[in-house]
Amino acid sequence: MNSAVEAQLAELGIEGYLKQHQYKSLLRFLTCGSVDDGKSTLIGRLLHDSKQIYEDQLAAVHSDSQRVGTTGEKPDLALLVDGLQAEREQGITIDVAYRYFSTQKRKFIIADTPGHEQYTRNMATGASTCDLAVILVDARKGILDQTRRHSFISNLLGLKHFVVAINKMDLVDYSQARFEEIRDEYLKFSENLTGDIDIQIIPISALEGDNVVDKGQNLNWFEGPSLLELLETVDVDYEKGAGEFRFPVQYVNRPNLDFRGFAGTVSSGSVKVGDAIKALPSGKTSTVARIVTFDGDIEEAQAGLAVTLTLNDEIDISRGDLIVLENAQVQTTNHLLADVVWMTEQPLQPGRDYDIKIAGKKTVGHVESIRHQYDINNLSTHGAAELPLNGIGLCEWSLNESVALDNYQDCADTGGFIIIDRLTNVTVGAGMVKESLTELERGLADVSAFELELNALVRKHFPHWEAKDLSQLLKK
């Protein structure tokens, strides 16, 4: 047992400790930045100085530091999170590593993301579930391309809180002038980022522990908070509950003939018993009869809560549909603009069909055109015929059916989607909806002869499937 937990158990008892832990707020954050900026070492220092490391873990770190460490005589705290053999041998981070810890004020989930350019897709994956980005900068090297790239991706993925931690201050003699030079350079770069972002810039030394958990004695000229103080006090809970009610249906819960509910997680906003709702894309309406949870019925469900909704009317709702309040204005379209992060060696090519998964909805779509590709270094744009590995571009998409969706900045769950290769079933990209475009009309010219023949065959030999006549539908 680690010493922090021991102290709290001694003070509160087991019941008091569990109760206090249950009601703490949760912050998900990632560490990102360029290669060797000290991301893994910073997380190791956070865990070590907040007394979250077990004695056997610390002993293993001391032992491994002699064999594969990179910090000389000192224990290499990066080994606490760099667990893959290849990571330890090369002294780098490859995969996203998750660590969990808590203080008396808050619970944390940390995503330690890789700094190398070829692992940008791993960084984007880690950032997609986070509330805050800790962007590491080496005080000797200053702002690098990968610093800009990770800042841009974090901004693209809707993160509203950035902590820019200027690390390795011990290697520049804790120079205030060097800190202010890098701070001003980053603030100038950040003017190109979109949205209302809260940016905090602090000096730290992850190796020595200065200004990570405790202030230390070497940065007396800095009057701001330590990194842990910032993480404990940043307000993200309000943002999670803000916004209009969105409830993507994950599955229809039918345990017996007397119960039919719709299970899922509230993506944003809240819903109460008695609220008038509508299901999209059908537009059918009803009212909420019950909100069912594992612990029994509740009167109101907030964002982040997994529940089953039952309705007062038997309306047709299936997996992938979206439940919203009756007066909500939600776009339903098969034509959209989205920023895409491409994650595979084979480039994204316009015209090729991919499986698209938005919330619980799965459909098929293709890129009509790539409007532009972003230059990560200066955030400018240029034309592109295809999108390469780790490329980020604005693409115009056409889907095979209309889907209810939001802009990603308004609701990540209903505005974000993954792109899946139809042959290999591998996730090849991630998309963030920027704008819904005018719905495209599909005619008979868009349907192949094979699809029409297959539709006729199904209706003839499998009438109980109740398949619609495709040729008649497309004439309407």
UniProtKB/Swiss-Prot annotation:
Uppermost EC category: transferase
Domain of life, per lineage: Bacteria
Taxonomic source organism: Vibrio parahaemolyticus serotype O3:K6 (strain RIMD 2210633)
Reaction catalyzed: sulfate + ATP + H(+) = adenosine 5'-phosphosulfate + diphosphate
Region annotation G3: where it falls in the sequence: 112-115
EC number(s) reported in the record: 2.7.7.4
Name the record gives this protein: Sulfate adenylyltransferase subunit 1
Region (G2): 91-95
NCBIfam families in the record: CysN, PRK05124.1, small_GTP
Binding sites annotated in the UniProt record for GTP: 33-40, 112-116, 167-170
Pfam families per record: GTP-eEF1A_C (PF22594), GTP_EFTU (PF00009)
Record-level Gene Ontology MF annotations: ATP binding; GTP binding; GTPase activity; sulfate adenylyltransferase (ATP) activity
Free-text function comment from the UniProt entry: With CysD forms the ATP sulfurylase (ATPS) that catalyzes the adenylation of sulfate producing adenosine 5'-phosphosulfate (APS) and diphosphate, the first enzymatic step in sulfur assimilation pathway. APS synthesis involves the formation of a high-energy phosphoric-sulfuric acid anhydride bond driven by GTP hydrolysis by CysN coupled to ATP hydrolysis by CysD.
GO BP annotation list: hydrogen sulfide biosynthetic process; sulfate assimilation
PROSITE patterns per record: G_TR_1, G_TR_2
InterPro entries per UniProt: CysN_GTP-bd, CysN_II, CysN_NoDQ_III, G_TR_CS, GTP-eEF1A_C, P-loop_NTPase, Small_GTP-bd, SO4_adenylTrfase_lsu
Keyword Lipid biosynthesis in record: no
Pathway assignment: Sulfur metabolism; hydrogen sulfide biosynthesis; sulfite from sulfate: step 1/3
Chain spans, region G1: 33-40
